[in-house]
From Swiss-Prot:
UniProt xrefs under Pfam families: Cytochrom_B561
Organism: Rattus norvegicus (Rat)
Name listed for the protein in its UniProt record: Transmembrane reductase CYB561D2
Record lineage: Eukaryota, Metazoa, Chordata, Craniata, Vertebrata
Membrane topology, as annotated: Multi-pass membrane protein
InterPro entries linked to this entry: CYB561D1/2, Cyt_b561/ferric_Rdtase_TM
Ranges where the Cytochrome b561 domain occurs: 14-217
């Protein structure tokens, strides 16, 4: 028996609500897990994984979920208010990422090790630089009068697409970090696989949200 369009819509909305709630919990849980594992303050390096997971797992995920019609924690507020909260969270994520990057550079300097010698380090640097550009681009959406020649709809589309790329870069950096000697020495077996699933799950949720809000809608328009 075929489901009606209305029933399918309700099911789809319920699935998106459930996946959004899962993304909130996973982003927070993964960050707490890394913090417990790293024990921030025990060494200079210990702050690096904590700050990077806080930036790319928790803050950036929450910033993007801010616009989810089903799972935004502030969906009762106006889009203008949510946009400003989004920008604040993105800025905090950038600051945490910059601090985390700076501390690991200092740590390697103290040990006399080469900088950006691994795929993880290179992906992390690219993700931080992209986040900086993304935050700068967000100013144009907060104050569209600064870019009068650009249609606001196109600015939103470009910003959303670029933001998705930046988020995936951050998630890639986290995934590569979980292949590092430090992480694999402390997390093994099933726990490692569960940890790897965390940024993959949140990335899928964010990809679905952005695709439905901007990319898919733009494709079906004549």
């Amino acid at each position: 028996m075929a489901l009606s369009v209305e029933t399918e819509s309700h099911i789809y909305r319920a699935l998106r609500t459930a996946s959004g709630a899962a993304a909130h919990l996973v982003a927070l849980g993964f960050t707490i897990f890394v913090a417990v594992l790293a024990r921030p303050g025990s060494s200079l390096f210990s702050w690096h994984p904590v700050l990077m997971s806080l930036a790319f797992s928790f803050l950036m995920t929450e910033a993007l979920l801010m616009f989810s019609p089903e799972s935004s924690l502030l969906r009762s507020l106006s889009r203008k208010v949510r946009a400003r909260c989004h920008w604040v969270l993105q800025l905090l994520a950038l600051l945490c990422a910059l601090l985390g990057l700076g501390l690991v550079i200092l740590h390697k300097e103290q040990l006399g090790k080469a900088h950006l010698a691994t795929r993880h380090g290179q992906a992390g640097l690219l993700a931080v630089l992209w986040a900086g550009l993304q935050c700068s681009g967000g100013v144009g959406l907060l104050y569209p009068k600064l870019l009068p020649r650009w249609p606001l709809a196109k600015l939103k589309l470009y910003h959303a697409t670029s933001g998705l790329v930046g988020y995936l870069l951050g998630s890639t950096s986290l995934l590569l970090g979980m292949c590092s000697l430090w992480f694999t020495a402390n997390v093994t077996g099933g726990a490692w696989y569960l940890a790897v699933l965390c940024p993959i799950l949140t990335s899928l949720v964010i990809m679905n949200q952005v695709s439905n809000a901007y990319l898919y809608r733009k494709r079906i328009q004549p």
